[in-house]
Amino acid sequence: ALNFDPNTQEVDAKLASQTVWLDAYITNVDRTFRNTNLLLWHKELWLIDHGAAFYFHHSWDTWEKHAMSPFALIKDHVLLPQATLIEEVNAEFQTLLTNEKLKTIVDLLPDDWLNWEGNEQTPDEIRAIYYQFLVLRKSHAATFVNQAQHARATLI
């Protein structure tokens, strides 16, 4: 696998828009020109290292505020210049990511990932917060989609 280099490699508008939408949705602050966290493997783009996503989990008390935020840091996304189809992707992902599907995904989180020193919540309580975050964030997707489109317009 090779590191993705935005100066020498291109991503089509659909994939760029899907990636920008996903990163705005999960509030991933770590896919920038300095650190793309993208690999090319057999001519396919792979998204790696989502450790900086869901940054609300550093302050559990504010998860609802983060779920409704515009996510201003999307302005630094490495694929934002190519992401011309964000509205189309939003419509597609709104249909694809049903609440039932989100619940299934969140239920797959292992208990070991949800237990850490100083944590007073059970894994099921933490899963419930992640699920609620994802559902609320999806219902407010227009906020982060508009933010991404505005940020993209300032680049052009």
Show which residues each predicted segment covers.
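Phosphate/dinucleotide-binding and metal-coordinating scaffold of catalytic cores
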Residues: 1-156
